[in-house]
Design a protein with these regions (language model features):
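OB-fold/S1-family single-stranded nucleic acid-binding modules
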Residues: 100-123
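Short nucleic-acid-contacting surface segments enriched for D/E, G, S/T with interspersed K/R
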Residues: 79-95
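Short, structured beta-strand/loop micro-motifs enriched in basic residues and often containing a Trp
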Residues: 71-79
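Short boundary/loop segments of OB/S1/cold-shock single-stranded nucleic-acid-binding domains
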Residues: 21-35
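Short aromatic-glycine-enriched beta-strand elements
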Residues: 47-58
């Protein structure tokens, strides 16, 4: 088998593994745990592959913590007709999701806004 064909063959074997690794949240987040975090939205990035939310949270002993969070794709948000304006920078929200295995992070699957609107984002 010529070298080019071998390289292409090996490359085709690797693509599914890389794809699965990217979409498996279990590598970065712990799907066996669910926590809730309440705070103020400091940044939003509405883009694929995952919508990103940053929050400032008052933790234990009144210490301010910055959290980085992800949720489903922008494509899913559109499909589910979730308007990006349902939360904005400066809003106080409560979120539930799977905590990061390292650091202050969360994979969000539920958002409760300050005015009582609850939005489910396809979680467990």
């Amino acid at each position: 088998m010529p070298i080019i064909r071998r390289i292409l063959f090996i490359g085709l074997l690797v693509v599914p593994v890389v794809s699965i690794a990217h979409h498996a949240i279990a590598g970065r987040y712990d799907p066996t745990k669910t926590i809730e975090v309440e705070g103020v939205v400091t940044n939003l990035l509405w883009r694929n592959p995952h919508v990103q939310v940053s929050m400032r949270v008052i933790g234990e002993n009144e210490i301010t913590q910055d959290w980085s969070m992800s949720t489903t794709s922008l494509s899913n948000m559109r499909r589910w007709q979730i308007d990006p304006d349902f939360i904005e920078v400066g809003d106080a929200i409560r979120v539930a999701g799977n905590p990061a295995r390292v650091g202050r992070g969360l994979y969000i699957f539920n958002v409760l806004t300050d005015d009582g609107e609850e939005v489910l984002l396809g979680g467990t």
